A protein has these predicted regions:
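Active-site-adjacent structural elements that line small-molecule/cofactor binding pockets in enzymes
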Residues: 1-132
């Protein structure tokens, strides 16, 4: 299947992309962000929310935000359990991951520094302990 579009701001000739996604109906659509309209967009358009954790932010805690997001989904007539929560920016710390699980996070994405192999390999080994 080929796509082509010629508009005022976007213009491309016929093209194709492979491999095609195996997820049906499509790969999960996650939205990051923490702004005032984020939850509106997550509830309307997305399969989940991906807040960047591990940095200070004012206002409600992550657990409180997850409750607010799920409540907003329910108010909009959407199954709150259909929203997946992915925490981005964590270090591989068992206590921190446990707190994320308690808060309602479904998946965590660890961050690794851009350093030499000798510095990063032990961190990858720590991350591997969380994969089951």
């Amino acid at each position: 299947e080929e796509a082509e579009f010629h508009g005022d701001h976007v213009n491309f000739d016929k093209m194709w992309a492979y491999p095609k996604p195996v997820q049906r109906p499509h790969p999960p659509i996650l939205m990051g962000g923490d702004g005032p309209r984020t939850f509106d967009r997550v509830v309307e358009y997305c399969d989940g929310w991906m807040p960047i954790t591990g940095r200070a932010s004012a206002g409600p805690s992550l657990a409180e935000k997850i409750v607010l997001l799920k409540r907003q989904a329910e108010d909009a007539g959407r199954d709150p359990d259909s929203l997946n929560i992915t925490s981005f920016g964590l270090r591989p710390d068992p206590d921190l991951v446990g707190r994320m699980q308690e808060a309602g996070v479904d998946r965590v994405i660890f961050t690794l520094p851009s350093e030499e192999r000798e510095a990063v390999t032990p961190l990858i080994d720590k991350c591997a302990k969380f994969i089951s």
